[in-house]
Amino acid sequence: DSTVQTLGIDSYRELQKAMNSVASEAAKSVVEVIGISGEQDWTEESYDNKNSVSGLIIADNGQELLIYGKTSILRDTKEIHIRFADGTTKQASVKKKDESLGFAIYAVAKSSIAQSTWQQISIATLGSSGSVQKGDAAVVLGKPFGYAGAVGFGTIASSRNELDGDDGSYPLLCTDIGAAEDGTGVIINLSGEVVGIIDQGISGNSSKELVTGYGISGLKSEIELLSNGQAVPYIGIRGLDVTAEIEAQGIPEGVYVRTVETDSPAMAAGIQSGDIITEAAGKKITSLSAYQ
């Protein structure tokens, strides 16, 4: 005989309490990155809230606290400020940015951060988005609903879609949680690990109103490069893998170039749509992921 398990109200309360605890701890690594224009007085809290995005504390290099976030706040910005989980605000600078994907590392001098703030913040733990499955619990933090400091609970609706970007493809995570059109933030699992970076700008029309983000595993190499002040390599192609079926037709194994970005290094090198890339920097290229 099959046994039907029911979730009583007490069990639900315990589950909700546990999820809130995970969210509260993970929120210590989430900040608000604020772009200040000359006309705005940040000391009077009068800046435009639309000129801010969520950021994630990802490293401490000994001198600076490093924060990963979108570059959209940099337009017409004269100063950058970081608001930490305890509500304190400190000035920041851009350490390195990737214009192609639209993310940057922002740096805050450790010497400017008070001891009381250190007790309320933490460095994020990055998980693996590759292990995320459809139906898994999802917690969203940051500014997914258009205002900072939010938290939402739901499930992963899709974990197998990808976004074709410059020089590679990026895994996407889509949830069943409603989102603001310009939502930013993070997706965490029940272990408190960050598995996704929310960017509603990449949502398709059908999922525009649902929290969507990059799987963190596809961003780790970029985060490491930017954190070290290094540029993310950019060639400027969008391509597809040459599958076994295509290879059987006499086309060499590699990456098929679908499009070439205007004024890109690829265009300058003479690469054209329809070309097959089989080697780069002396190494054989067998797939788009290997090329990336």
What do these predicted regions represent?
Residues 60-104, 109-111:
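Catalytic-histidine neighborhood of serine endopeptidases
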Residues 1-52, 79-81, 103, 112-117, ...:
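N-terminal targeting leaders that route proteins to membranes or the secretory/organellar pathways
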Residues 30-34, 65-70, 131-144, 175-176, ...:
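Active-site-proximal beta-strands of protease catalytic cores
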Residues 111-123, 152-210, 247, 251-259:
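Active-site region of chymotrypsin-like
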Residues 12-21, 37-70, 89-91, 123-125, ...:
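A conserved glycine-rich beta-strand in the N-terminal activation segment of trypsin-fold
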Residues 18, 22, 190, 194-250:
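C-terminal cap/linker of serine protease catalytic domains
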Residues 47, 178-181, 227-291:
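PDZ/PDZ-like groove recognition
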